[in-house]
Design a protein with these regions (language model features):
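Short glycine-enriched nucleophile-adjacent loop
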Residues: 5-16, 22
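Short catalytic/ligand-binding loop motif for oxyanion handling, primarily in non-cytosolic enzymes
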Residues: 6-8, 31-33, 80-82, 133-137
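Proline-centered flexible-loop/turn and helix-kink motifs
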Residues: 16-17, 121
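The feature captures the conserved acid-bearing segment of alpha/beta-hydrolase catalytic domains
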Residues: 21, 29-119
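A structural signal for isolated positions on well-ordered beta-strands in alpha/beta enzyme cores
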Residues: 23, 71, 124-126
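N-terminal Rossmann-fold cofactor-binding loop
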Residues: 26
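C-terminal catalytic histidine-bearing segment of alpha/beta-hydrolase fold enzymes
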Residues: 107-154
């Protein structure tokens, strides 16, 4: 959840072969995207995969990434936005995100969902009503059920 969700999302791009399933929530509405460019703007790591080979000395394995079942969730009232602060993103990244994905957490989350769906990423997106930047027992139970289901299909 939150910063650990952002870490998990990025780790899955770098090492998709090590992940059987993942669940992330409360991540500022900004997912790393399986795109080199959006609206003709280069999306470098940690926003996208434009410079992936240069950084990791391997190509991004989109097929392996697509094979990961992902449970991605946000609270509808979550407006916690690390994108707007220097400790999370630099000025160039912040401008790319705000201009191309949206400056509002919830709209950005919807845009990221569109991109994941267009790329056929194996993700289930859930938005929880009346929830901000926190978890509830309902959310925790859904995450548990998601992982139990993944264990049973393995």
């Amino acid at each position: 959840f939150s910063a650990s969700a952002t870490f998990t999302n990025r780790f899955a791009f770098i090492h998709p072969e090590k992940i059987k399933a993942l669940a992330i929530g409360g991540f500022n509405g900004e997912l790393m995207l399986p795109e080199k460019k959006i609206n003709q703007f280069k999306f470098n790591y940690p926003l996208g995969i434009h410079d992936f080979y240069q950084l990791f000395n391997k190509n991004f394995d989109i097929n392996q990434f697509k094979s990961i079942p992902q449970f991605i969730y946000m609270g509808k009232l979550d407006d916690n936005d690390a994108v707007q602060f220097d400790d999370a993103y630099n000025d160039i990244e912040r401008n790319l995100i705000n201009t191309n994905l949206g400056s509002d957490v919830q709209n950005r989350y919807l845009k990221c969902q569109e991109i994941y769906k267009k790329k056929n990423i194996n993700a289930t997106f859930i938005t929880y009503e009346n929830v901000g930047h926190w978890t509830t027992s309902e959310m925790n139970l859904e995450v548990i059920k998601f992982f139990l289901n993944q264990m049973q299909t393995d």
